[in-house]
């Protein structure tokens, strides 16, 4: 799991930023299956929004 923020003030929870996090650019574990098996707008969007493989895809 990657840290959400460089400052280390963010925590990841279920693939996205933990509730109450005061981060503007939060990034948690990327959903590689989502970007490879589904169509997403961007890898960055998947990394921010995916909680399970492909769950960020429409």
From Swiss-Prot:
Residues annotated as binding a divalent metal cation 5? 34, 38, 56-57
Regulation: induction:
By cadmium.
Provide the disulphide bond pattern: none
| Similarity remark | Belongs to the metallothionein superfamily. Type 3 family.
| Stretches for region Beta | 1-29
> Origin organism of this chain?
Potamon potamios
Which GO terms of the molecular function aspect are on file? metal ion binding
Report the domain of life of the source organism: Eukaryota
Q: Which InterPro entries match?
A: Metalthion_crustacean, Metalthion_dom_sf
This chain's protein is named Metallothionein
Keywords per UniProt: Cadmium, Metal-binding, Metal-thiolate cluster
Binding residues for a divalent metal cation 6: 40, 46, 50, 57
**Positions bound to a divalent metal cation 2:** 5, 10, 23, 26
Q: What does this protein do?
A: Metallothioneins have a high content of cysteine residues that bind various heavy metals. Class I MTS in crustacea are involved in the sequestration of elevated levels of heavy-metal ions.
* Signal peptide coordinates: none
Q: Which residues bind a divalent metal cation 1?
A: 4-5, 17, 21
Transmembrane ranges? none
